[in-house]
Amino acid sequence: MIIISKSAKHYLSKLLSKKKKGTNIKLSIENKDKENLTCQIKYFDKKEENFNYTKFNFIDFKVYVKKNIFIYIKKIKIDIESKSLKDEIIIKIFKKRENLKNRISNFIKYKINSKLEYHGGFVELIDIKENMFVILKFFGGCNGCSMAKVTLKEGIEKEIKKNFPNIKGVIDITDHIHSESSFY
């Protein structure tokens, strides 16, 4: 979904009126690294249109975005911000949290749990909070293990933060009960 403010629509229409007929807007969005998306507004000639793009129709123009980027994005908001004597286009990209949750869950499953399984344990992603803290729960040999806190802070949290820079930290919600299956 693309939301364009009234002032941004007017601004873009004014820019496009100076171009040849049939010129529209393309949002060029790139996944530069694991977490950060960058976006540029470019002119887009109707001749470039093909099945790789999703088209959004507005009254005076169309906006094209590559289809494959919508696996990361929930919505895009375009607005105008006045700075000094000039207007500046501001683009805000709202990413899908579900996608981040799936990516972190898969990371835990394949990178973290492959190490924990040597101790007969594993960890599961429970949730990602709005404040970007990951909520985890230990199972098997990790539940009740005296090294669980160290494993959480020095191993799991560091790996997750390194691979997902927007994540602020990790919280363990396990009710640790030492048992025969606990590793230490």
Curated annotation (Swiss-Prot):
Listed cofactors: [4Fe-4S] cluster
Keyword annotations: 4Fe-4S, Iron, Iron-sulfur, Metal-binding
Leader peptide range in chain numbering: none
GO BP terms: iron-sulfur cluster assembly; protein maturation
Record note on cofactor: Binds 1 [4Fe-4S] cluster per subunit. The cluster is presumably bound at the interface of two monomers.
SUPFAM superfamilies with a match to the protein in the record: Fe-S cluster assembly (FSCA) domain-like, HesB-like domain
Keyword Kinase in annotation: no
Residues involved in [4Fe-4S] cluster binding: C142, C145
Pfam families documented for this protein: NifU
Transport listed as a keyword: no
An example molecular function term from Gene Ontology annotations: 4 iron, 4 sulfur cluster binding
InterPro entries recorded: Fe/S_biogenesis_protein_NfuA (IPR017726), FSCA_dom_sf (IPR034904), HesB-like_dom_sf (IPR035903), NIF_FeS_clus_asmbl_NifU_C (IPR001075)
Top-rank taxon: Bacteria
Subunit structure: Homodimer.
Similarity section: Belongs to the NfuA family.
Function text: Involved in iron-sulfur cluster biogenesis. Binds a 4Fe-4S cluster, can transfer this cluster to apoproteins, and thereby intervenes in the maturation of Fe/S proteins. Could also act as a scaffold/chaperone for damaged Fe/S proteins.
Identification of the protein by name: Fe/S biogenesis protein NfuA
